Swiss-Prot record:
GTP binds at residues 166-173, 191-195, 212-215, 279-282, 308-310. Disulfide bonds: none annotated. It comes from Rhodopseudomonas palustris (strain BisB5). It is found in: Cytoplasm. InterPro entries: G_OBG, GTP-bd, GTP-bd_Obg/CgtA, GTP1-OBG_CS, GTP1_OBG_dom, GTP1_OBG_dom_sf, OBG_GTPase, P-loop_NTPase. The gene is obg. GO terms for biological process: ribosome biogenesis. Its cofactor is Mg(2+). This is GTPase Obg. HAMAP family: GTPase_Obg.
């Protein structure tokens, strides 16, 4: 299945049905009273977080979604039926953002969570509603109210416990394939990984989800390479595993490059707990490995782990370190900065005349 983490869609809730002007017509009853029914309410546009989805690819092929219109009222006091809601299914971790790409409307963090994005218009009153002691035969009715329409952005931020970051060719995909059943593409050239990959890791009986993010290069926050568009997927991670290639020219500079891009994207990423590991230790001589380790230690101000995704050396220790942090980190069930649900607001209703 193709991966798509951003989509722009048009949504419109259903219009309300019109009220009806009608009068009772029966034999021997010359002046039957009003009996026009009310119009039905238009359908809502609802977004629901569904299990089993991990991409927004469906919204590449369909961008317009309209809920059903309410049925018009009819004579004999027959009220119109309400229009059917339309439900958009999205993966857990999806954010709804306004057309300006800045205003966050809702953030889905749990399976089954629902959000009313646009309410259907209320149905109009039929003339029977306006009957009174002073107006026995009202000859007017309300039209139904129009539904709401807007363009919105759907943005997916995968929910993973831990995230893999590093320069291209740091060995992130090899590491993920070693510790999980994920099968990312692995090759000896930069940007082999074009989309985030997820894998379920088991460490001493404890399971967690690990995300492999496409490699970063200097200037990624300005669009260089694949840019920083995929960094949003590690915003929800509780810990980052920063892999540095031991065969690179200078491990310390490589570390600072990635840290600089993380900081340029969002300060919250640099505040996350980070485990630093020097990867591909099987591909360098002992003397060179010691130099790279010392360089990385000075840059990161912590002692790095020494691992090899190919031979598996040091990998169990890295997984235990991740699992220990994940086990201690609190999990928040609250959505992040969500706007008030439209359903909380009192809907407009036609006024009595």
């Amino acid at each position: 299945m193709k991966f798509l983490d951003e989509a722009k869609v048009y949504i419109r809730s259903g219009d309300g049905g019109n009220g009806c002007v009608a009068f009772r017509r029966e034999k021997f009853i010359e002046f039957g009273g009003p009996n026009g029914g009310n119009g039905g309410r238009g359908g809502d546009v609802v977004v629901e977080a569904a299990d089993g989805l991990n991409t927004l690819i469906d919204y590449r092929y369909q961008q317009h979604f309209k809920a059903q219109k309410g049925v018009n009222g009819m004579g004999s006091d027959r009220h119109g039926a309400n229009g059917k809601d339309i439900v958009l299914k999205v993966p857990v971790g999806t954010q709804i953002i306004d057309e300006d790409k800045e205003t966050l409307l809702h953030d889905f963090t749990k399976v089954g969570e629902r959000f009313v994005l646009a309410e259907g218009g209320n149905g109009g009153f039929g003339n029977a509603h306006f009957k009174s002691s002073t107006n026995r035969a009202p000859r007017h009715a309300n039209p139904g109210l129009p539904g709401e329409e807007r363009w919105i952005w759907l943005r997916l931020k995968l929910i993973a416990d831990a995230g893999l970051v590093g320069l291209p060719n740091a060995g992130k995909s090899t590491f993920l394939s070693k510790v999980s059943a994920a099968k990312p593409k692995i090759a000896d050239y930069p940007f082999t990984t074009l989309h985030p990959q997820l894998g379920v890791v088991n460490s001493d009986g404890r399971e967690f989800v690990l995300a492999d993010i496409p490699g970063l290069i200097e200037g990624a926050h300005e669009g260089a390479g694949l840019g920083d568009r995929f960094l949003g997927h590690v915003e929800r991670c509780r810990v980052l595993l920063h892999l540095i290639d031991a065969t690179c020219e200078h491990a310390g500079k490589a570390y600072k490059t990635v840290r600089g891009e993380l900081e340029a994207y969002a300060d919250t990423l640099t505040d996350k707990i980070e485990i630093v590991a020097l990867n591909k230790i099987d591909a360098v001589e002992p003397d060179e490995l010691k130099k790279q380790k010392d360089r990385l230690k000075r840059a990161a101000k912590k002692t790095p782990l020494l691992i090899s995704g190919v031979t598996g050396a040091g990998v169990p220790e890295a997984l235990r370190a991740l699992a220990a942090v994940i086990g201690e980190a609190p999990v928040s069930d609250k959505a992040i900065g969500t706007a008030q649900n439209a359903a909380d607001a009192k809907p407009w209703a036609p006024q009595d005349v």
